[in-house]
């Protein structure tokens, strides 16, 4: 298990991703596991993240924040020579977070990242990037990001019936610069989030919000109402074109919550998720 003594440089890694993206071909995922021990949280950075995602400023880490800490390790793995798919152009389909207990800003963390479960998708191939946070050797947080690489799919997707969105419990104005602001705190400087001209090269009419920002923004709306241990699943649907006006709706489902984010004018879905008590 390769052990990292410092956080990987994302600027250099994204440059590498652009230069090597067209040469990546493969059929197997690497079995590499990256680990970075003794990670401390920068309080200033945490506060900036809280403000961008609209979490309260506390000594407890938002449930989505460890994803940001592990993201450089994910990018390092996805830009290694043995990784079969290019980073640029991979689509974030879904994200699951399992929180066993809250994390505090003064705890020393060990980050661990690996990739698994390569499988067919109607539009190509998909795989799971697994991130873990351990404290004193005990796992306390797990994130599963499912990515799609388009091309050579297994068949056509089933047509989706149009479903009218629920009545929003809140309407949020998403500013045009949220992609750049979230990129500054997350390190995710994929060009589709930064500028409309760059986004058009990838088929988007305008820059789009990060999927993990939309998930974080939704979970910020639940602060003070969630248990200490829970699992939150999200499926990303249509992108949020910036600037935007979005509707947010939440409802109780069994013992947990269901929530949706959608275009406030057209009802086009951006995200659907559930929060389930327990881990």
Please identify what each model-predicted range represents.
Residues 34-36, 142, 229-231:
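Hydrophobic residues on conserved beta-strands that form the core of alpha/beta folds
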Residues 1-94, 154-225:
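Hot-dog-fold acyl-thioester-processing enzymes
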Residues 61-115, 125, 214-249, 256:
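Hydrophobic beta-strand-centered segment that forms part of the acyl-chain substrate-binding groove
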Residues 1-29, 73-75, 93-174, 242, ...:
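HotDog/MaoC-like acyl-thioester-processing domains
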